[in-house]
Amino acid sequence: MNFIKILALAVLVLFLAGCGKPVPPDKVSYVGEWQSKTMYLLITQDGSVRYKRLKGGVTTSMEGPLQGFSGDNFDVGLGPMSSTFVVSKPPYQDGAQWKMVVDGEELLRGAQ
């Protein structure tokens, strides 16, 4: 009986994880692979987000659906397992390079 409950919960979690909101047209500049030496952020057009950061010797990572934008900031995850990414500088072009500042970290779009 417990196995069936666990299996049902796992299926529900997988189903909900695929329920991200697509990136709205006015935020399409957020889509892409962003990175610095200590942070990696992938935002896909369909609303999937992958994040990894090394800070103070601790690695934090997260994968989940995009829940939406609040101004320049965006929310990722489900319920209590969600996080708000604070964007102090939304995507902008500096010469040939696209940049964005998320959670105080300057990120570059594209391979480094």
Describe each region flagged by the PLM.
Residues T38-S83:
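N-terminal glycine/threonine-rich, aromatic-flanked beta-hairpin/loop signature
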Residues A10-V13:
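Short, linear, compositionally biased motifs with a strong N-terminal bias
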Residues M1-A8:
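Bacterial N-terminal signal peptides that target proteins for export
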Residues D26-Y40:
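Tryptophan-anchored aromatic micro-motifs
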Residues K99-Q112:
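Edge beta-strand at a domain terminus
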Residues G20-P22:
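Bacterial signal peptide processing site
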Residues F15-G18:
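C-terminal motif of bacterial Sec signal peptides marking the signal peptidase cleavage site
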Residues S83-Q97:
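Low-complexity, intrinsically disordered Gly/Pro/Thr-rich segments
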